[in-house]
Amino acid sequence: MLKQQSTLSLVMIAMFAALTAVGAFIKIPLPLVPFTLQIVFVFLAGCLLGGRNGFQSQLVYIGIGLVGLPVFTQGGGITYVLQPTFGYLIGFALAALVIGYMIDRVESPTKKHFIVANIIGLIIIYAVAVPYLYVALNVWLNMKSSWSHVFLVGFVNSIVADFCLAIASALLAERLYKVFRSARAIKLVQIEKENV
């Protein structure tokens, strides 16, 4: 039973890692920080997979990119940690963890729960990404940039769109959550029948 449940979880983790990779290539080029749809799948991973599995889906995505597969917006490889935007990827993993943890704590999450969780996840992403962007530009890339410039390109340019995506993802998650919960329930019934 445990083995079959973990197999289902692994499939979901792999699926959301792949979806996050796909989201990296649906982008609008902007200075330093391109706008992508990755964040949608981060929100959905947290909302639908829960804290642990949502977090793991983003770790898998990051791991695949760091070993060399070009799944990030600007390629892949271990040196990608030096990219100014790598902080967003760290933020993605932490956001999925916190979003999932918040949803996991509610027995029957509502639209409000998903929206609040996603907004908090969005805050976490930017809280990690903007300082990382500043340090990357000023320390190891030696591209002297003021906090105001970093705040503009790393936050102001994309926060409105990301906020809208957080709300839209929450509304979608509310509907999909019931489907995911039903699928898990059906799977458990099948497993119980097999064990009878």
From Swiss-Prot:
It is found in: Cell membrane. Keywords: Cell membrane, Membrane, Transmembrane, Transmembrane helix, Transport. GO terms for molecular function: biotin transmembrane transporter activity. The keyword Metal-binding does not apply. GO terms for cellular component: plasma membrane. InterPro entries: BioY. The chain crosses the membrane at residues 8-28, 30-50, 59-79, 81-101, 114-134, 150-170. Signal peptide: none annotated. It is a multi-pass membrane protein. Probable biotin transporter. Belongs to the BioY family. This is Probable biotin transporter BioY. It comes from Lysinibacillus sphaericus (Bacillus sphaericus). The gene is bioY.
